[in-house]
From Swiss-Prot:
Cellular component GO terms held in the UniProt record: cytoplasm
SUPFAM superfamilies: Elongation factor Ts (EF-Ts), dimerisation domain (SSF54713), UBA-like (SSF46934)
Involved in Mg(2+) ion dislocation from EF-Tu as annotated region, ranges: 80-83
MF term (GO), any: translation elongation factor activity
Keywords, ordered alphabetically: Cytoplasm, Elongation factor, Protein biosynthesis
Places the protein is found: Cytoplasm
Source species, domain of life: Bacteria
Major site of localization recorded for this protein: cytoplasm
Entry protein name: Elongation factor Ts
Stretches assigned to coiled coil: none
Species annotation: Lysinibacillus sphaericus (strain C3-41)
Function: Associates with the EF-Tu.GDP complex and induces the exchange of GDP to GTP. It remains bound to the aminoacyl-tRNA.EF-Tu.GTP complex up to the GTP hydrolysis stage on the ribosome.
Membership in a protein family: Belongs to the EF-Ts family.
Length: 295
């Protein structure tokens, strides 16, 4: 039998929102397997977890730079929101974006070794900023995208960079529409562009959880399969961009809005500052959606 530590119970509780005793029971039932315990709680209807309740700790900003047919989105972390709004910090972030987009390093590790025109490594540029500003600063991640003259980038920063989204519309030069799609992604936080990107393994896992949920609700076995397929459709709406109702027009699917531009979504990147590091992430969805609908 696995050793069910208090830390493991705490982690499961943070991820699911379930009660402490329910979390402990789930871990016992699944022999300490955290992912299996999450599924166990979901099957029992005890999990209130959602992707918007990720745990984060870092402050900082996201930033997007477009230059012709190239664009970069990056995240730079600091220890406090106060420093993230500091002019010197913002100048550093802008400079990093320009250097990375020019050199196109393959990784953060490679990026830190790049030198500017004065021969100073990016790692040392950051260290100098740390000494000046007085907080730890980290280049956490970045992604570079390219397009053709027939395509368009959609870039959107929410709350001055708390969330950043970069999307590419292929076959459409409607940059305004591309930005609208980026706003939608910021608000709703899809995981995939379309159902084709969802692995068969993930679909089967979700089907199993939904089946157990229906059975635990006391539904007759002869209608469970039909119910599960209906709920699976709702799952795809939650995670797939093209299946979602467009935030600026809930009567229209994103798929139809994009089709009206004559283009298609060729991928997107969405960064939320500090996601995945220990501290509860604010729920930005309602705030972003209200702002989007006002545009």
């Amino acid at each position: 039998m696995a050793n069910i530590t208090a830390q493991l119970v705490k982690e499961l509780r943070e991820k699911t929102g379930a009660g402490m005793m329910d979390c402990k029971k789930a871990l016992v039932q699944t022999d300490g397997d955290l992912e299996a315990a999450i599924d166990f709680l979901r099957e029992k209807g005890l999990s209130s977890a959602a992707k918007k309740a990720d745990r984060i700790a870092a402050e900082g900003t996201t930033y997007i730079l477009e230059q012709g047919n190239e664009a970069i989105i990056l995240e730079v972390n600091a220890e406090t929101d106060f420093v993230a709004k500091n002019d010197k910090f913002q100048v550093l972030v802008s400079s990093l974006a320009e250097q990375l987009l020019t050199a196109k390093p393959a990784s953060v590790e490679a990026a830190l070794e790049l030198t500017n025109a004065e021969g100073v490594k990016i790692e040392d540029q950051i260290s100098t900023a740390v000494a000046t500003i007085g907080e730890k600063i980290t280049l956490r991640r970045f992604e570079i995208k390219t397009k053709t003259d027939a395509d368009s980038f959609g870039a959107y920063l929410h709350m001055g960079g708390r969330i950043g989204v970069l999307v590419t519309l292929e076959g459409s030069t409607d940059a305004s529409a591309a930005k609208d799609v980026a706003m939608h992604i910021a608000a709703i936080n899809p995981t995939y562009v379309s159902r084709d990107e969802v692995s068969a393994e993930e679909v089967e896992r979700e089907r199993k959880v939904l089946t157990e949920q229906a059975l635990n609700e006391g539904k007759p076995e002869n209608i469970v399969a039909k119910m599960v397929e209906g709920r699976l459709g709702k799952y795809f709406e939650d995670v797939c961009l093209l299946d979602q109702s467009f935030v600026k027009n809930s009567d229209q699917k994103v798929r139809d809005f994009v089709a009206s531009t004559g283009g298609s979504v060729n991928g997107f990147v969405r960064y939320a500052v500090g996601e995945g590091i220990e501290k509860r992430e604010d729920n930005f969805a309602e705030e972003v959606m209200s702002q989007v609908k006002g545009n």
